[in-house]
Amino acid sequence: MKDNRDYIGYGSKDFSFEWPNKSKLALQFVLNYEEGAENSILNGDTSSESFLSEIVNAKPIQGNRHMNMESIYEYGSRRGFWRIHKEFKRRNLPLTIFGVGMALEKNPDVCEQIIKSDYEVASHGYRWIDYQNIDEQTEIEHTILCNKLINKIFGYYPSGWYTGRTS
């Protein structure tokens, strides 16, 4: 296998960049919305989720549900989104939602608040799964499905794309 990584980058050259209006700091607030799209036998997967949780060294449970893992993910849709949404509305702050298509499908109330709040929606994929070993055609289909789904729900195609898992 040929190593084609870039180990040099800018090297010794200084990188100079100036933000508009000579600003010193630019912030973007992003909320990942993934709940319900993770690995689960309820979604037709062979095992439960094991990625990004408070469970140290979590292992997928084959052929069965992982109730602790599901509870951790469900917190985001049941309380997490609403607490963050309330605070952002109180402070009149803009927010970008990195929305996973299947997760958005499962919670119309969250989608309604995203619309009412005029939050920007970027695609975070159709499923919250590791795509590294998924065939290319399925990944393409999921990309198209998610884009169409976001357009159907929000009336526009996603403003951007961020795949948060290996692809």
Segments from the language model and where they lie:
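Catalytic alpha-helical scaffold of carbohydrate-active enzymes acting on polysaccharides/glycoconjugates
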Residues: 2-167
